[in-house]
């Protein structure tokens, strides 16, 4: 438990995740200055000791509020992968995905959402960047390119939760039809 809110503990990655609201309550002036400096690029936030789904889970537990600057900064501070060139994500948003993962408050859907957003935003393919396919009875290609913030992307993903039966054949047909329609070369098809 933290009792000295004036210390530099706010630079710790896990402390930023767990105590972000408490920092604001106990030392609003310093926390506001830190968040302002963070958005201006004057300081960095540590994010190396957490999983992507930790950030997603914290966000999804608080839909009733504005964007969370700390969670956005922690997401943006994640390491950029080196070779995401031709990945097309198929996201399962079905009811079975709401199951708890590892016996924690994190759901399997939180993990799927984290991987979906991270992979799509770092994909270098002109065909698949910022796009994913819904894994449902009527799959769709969803474009996240107009979403600037993590919260916005999560909101779009939430709209595509689908409790219907998943259909692998329909997903493959959608990929094939879209590739033919857009005259995608075989070498550019997703892996």
Describe each model-derived feature in a short phrase.
Residues 17-191:
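Acidic, glycine-rich A-domain
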Residues 2-5, 9:
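Single conserved hydrophobic/aromatic residue that forms the stacking wall/gate
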């Amino acid at each position: 438990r933290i009792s000295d809110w004036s210390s530099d503990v706010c630079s710790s990655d896990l402390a930023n995740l767990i105590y972000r609201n408490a920092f604001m309550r106990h030392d609003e002036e310093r926390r506001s200055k830190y968040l302002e400096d963070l958005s201006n690029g004057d300081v960095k936030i540590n994010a190396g000791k957490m999983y992507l789904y930790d950030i997603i889970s914290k966000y999804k537990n608080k839909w009733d509020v504005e964007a969370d600057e700390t969670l956005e900064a922690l997401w943006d501070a994640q390491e950029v992968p080196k070779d995401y060139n031709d990945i097309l994500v198929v996201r399962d948003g079905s009811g079975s995905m709401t199951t708890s993962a590892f016996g924690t408050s994190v759901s399997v859907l939180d993990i799927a959402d984290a991987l979906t957003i991270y992979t799509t935003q770092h994909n270098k393919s002109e065909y698949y960047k910022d796009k994913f396919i819904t894994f449902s009875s009527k799959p769709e290609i969803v474009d996240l390119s107009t979403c600037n913030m993590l919260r916005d992307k999560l909101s779009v993903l939430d709209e595509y939760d689908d409790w219907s039966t998943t259909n692998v054949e329909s997903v493959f047909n959608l990929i094939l039809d879209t590739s033919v329609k857009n005259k995608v070369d075989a070498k550019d098809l997703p892996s």
